[in-house]
């Protein structure tokens, strides 16, 4: 039986070796073509710092994801330029729960309501 096992293993090994040789034959012409192309065109290929387009975009400075980001940044710049308001207002927001006595009186509307008729 041991002879049978050895005989069975031998064809498997030879088929694996044949498969490797076939793979080498298939890839070797491809690799040969790659070597030829690289020798003809040495500048073409993956660059370590990424593509030229990406490098150019990164050098330009801060860019915005969309128009919302642009408008938010623009609003922040305007807020920095505006002078701050004087602290004469003493409105309290969120410190306590308002009661009807705490609320200021409602001002009458300048426009007459169509419903009041």
Swiss-Prot record:
One of its GO terms (biological process) is mitotic cell cycle. GO terms for molecular function: phosphatase inhibitor activity; protein phosphatase 2A binding; protein phosphatase inhibitor activity; protein phosphatase regulator activity. It comes from the Eukaryota. It is found in: Cytoplasm. Signal peptide: none annotated. Residues 1-37 have a biased composition (Basic and acidic residues). The modification Phosphothreonine is found at residue 99. Residues 1-54, 77-117 are annotated as: Disordered. Interacts (when phosphorylated at Ser-67) with ppp2r2d. PANTHER family: CAMP-REGULATED PHOSPHOPROTEIN 19, ENDOSULFINE. Belongs to the endosulfine family. This is cAMP-regulated phosphoprotein 19-B. It comes from Xenopus laevis (African clawed frog).
């Amino acid at each position: 039986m041991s002879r049978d096992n050895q005989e069975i293993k031998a064809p498997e090994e030879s088929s694996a070796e044949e498969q490797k040789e076939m793979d080498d034959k298939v890839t070797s012409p491809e690799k040969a073509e790659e070597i030829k192309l690289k020798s003809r065109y040495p500048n073409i290929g993956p660059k370590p710092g990424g593509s030229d387009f990406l490098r150019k975009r990164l050098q330009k400075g801060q860019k915005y994801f969309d128009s919302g980001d642009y408008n938010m940044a623009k609003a922040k710049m305007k807020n920095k330029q505006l002078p701050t308001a004087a602290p004469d207002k003493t409105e309290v927001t969120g410190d306590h729960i308002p009661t009807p006595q705490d609320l200021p009186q409602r001002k009458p509307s300048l426009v007459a309501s169509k419903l009041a008729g």
